[in-house]
Amino acid sequence: MVADVLLTHFNQLFCLNDPGHPLTGQEMKKATIVEDGYIAIKDGLIVALGSGEPDAELVGPQTIMRSYKGKIATPGIIDCHTHLVYGGSREHEFAKKLAGVSYLDILAQGGGILSTVRATRSASFDNLYQKSKRLLDYMLLHGVTTVEAKSGYGLDWETEKRQLDVVAALEKDHPIDLVSTFMAAHAIPEEYKGNPKAYLDVIIKDMLPVVKEENLAEFCDIFCEKNVFTADESRYLLSKAKEMGFKLRIHADEIASIGGVDVAAELSAVSAEHLMMITDDGIAKLIGAGVIGNLLPATTFSLMEDTYAPARKMIDAGMAITLSTDSNPGSCPTANMQFVMQLGCFMLRLTPLEVLNAVTINAAYSVNRQERVGSLTVGKEADIAIFDAPNIDYPFYFFATNLIHQVYKKGQLTVDRGRIL
């Protein structure tokens, strides 16, 4: 078979492993590493991997050949938890954060999520589209090739749908692949204050059926937290969403442990998000149910909290984890997955290989894209992040700098030395 594109002489290829399930325990520490590696691409798919000089049959007169001595290649990075589409920004809350006002106190004052809801409701489709596109461009420049994107800053049908429509449009227009999550249960709207059950009934009866019918989202999510939605309320919504055919995610145990992990385990959610306050019993329940823990260390960093999710304990117990940005305008205003990966080492005490597995193959399972992406494997899409680094330790050791040299998306050179092509 003659390749369309042949990428050769990488210091190392991090092909990683895909055993047919998310990696856990000791599996997180391992990878298939190819020295002096090459990748052959045809029709956007990986058709061959190897070491040294490529087989002659891969090379034809039209084959594009590029050499990458001194560089490493990994699967494209996957950010599997973002709040991508929103109006406005919240830097006006920064001084309060520095003064020690808590996230929930800011929310109770009408700020936080509710502030962004007001800005998003007043934003046009084009405004939201352009703002979200800029974020995606930034992510792509940092090696991200697949992104999960939630609604949740409308809290009414008109705005929630506008957010989902923006995600759908960007999925068509932008190189990054987007996976849509419906999260109208992100907060209790001011018009339903004191009556969250009535709002959940509106979501269940009026919103979810349309989202499903129009195929606007694959997942459903809810914020199970003190002063937001209780475990019983979360169970009520997610069980109905599951009956309609949605895959489930849940924000749980971020600020307080109030039963969200139990809901995730009972309903076999694909992932439980945040988990800074998870207990040993909660870890055991998620392991037993096969729920992936999606950890968001940049949120802890941004909130200036001391308690990070117990990633080391989770992995050692045999739990599958991912890492994501939680990109949003309030509790985590960043879109930099490289920074998140570095926090995975510095603050969660994970090894570079554990982090790399978390943000590639495990993240692919978290967004139900494991058949297509997440590892450099023959037959999968050629989503490739190329780092200007001699080995996998370097991008973690040399932190706070974008070390992406190039990005390939479905076999197309998409980013070249800081420019989107």
From Swiss-Prot:
Pfam families: Amidohydro_1. It catalyses: 4-imidazolone-5-propanoate + H2O = N-formimidoyl-L-glutamate. Keywords: Cytoplasm, Histidine metabolism, Hydrolase, Iron, Metal-binding, Zinc. Coiled coil: none annotated. It is found in: Cytoplasm. Its EC number is 3.5.2.7. GO terms for molecular function: imidazolonepropionase activity; iron ion binding; zinc ion binding. Fe(3+) binds at residues 81, 83, 251, 326. Its cofactor is Zn(2+); Fe(3+). This is Imidazolonepropionase. It comes from Streptococcus pyogenes serotype M2 (strain MGAS10270). The gene is hutI.
